[in-house]
Amino acid sequence: MAVPKKKTSKAKKNMRRSHHALTAIGLVTCEKCGAPKRAHRVCLECGDYKGTQVLETAE
């Protein structure tokens, strides 16, 4: 069975993990109702996407 010949250093381990960081969700405000929504997605408050009504909402 294969085993490592040398111990992996902290620097090498951290360089390997440099791309594992989490990023924050991109929030924007809806142009129609002003509610916060995720970028490039339908607004859950008013159902609007790029100026067109996509979802039916109970208002």
Curated annotation (Swiss-Prot):
The keyword Chloroplast does not apply. SUPFAM superfamilies: Zn-binding ribosomal proteins (SSF57829). Keywords: Ribonucleoprotein, Ribosomal protein. InterPro entries: Ribosomal_bL32, Ribosomal_bL32_bact, Ribosomal_zn-bd. The keyword Signal does not apply. One of its GO terms (cellular component) is large ribosomal subunit. GO terms for biological process: translation. It holds the Pfam family Ribosomal_L32p. It comes from the Bacteria. GO terms for molecular function: structural constituent of ribosome. Belongs to the bacterial ribosomal protein bL32 family. This is Large ribosomal subunit protein bL32. It comes from Fusobacterium nucleatum subsp. nucleatum (strain ATCC 25586 / DSM 15643 / BCRC 10681 / CIP 101130 / JCM 8532 / KCTC 2640 / LMG 13131 / VPI 4355). The lineage of its organism: Bacteria, Fusobacteriati, Fusobacteriota, Fusobacteriia, Fusobacteriales. The gene is rpmF.
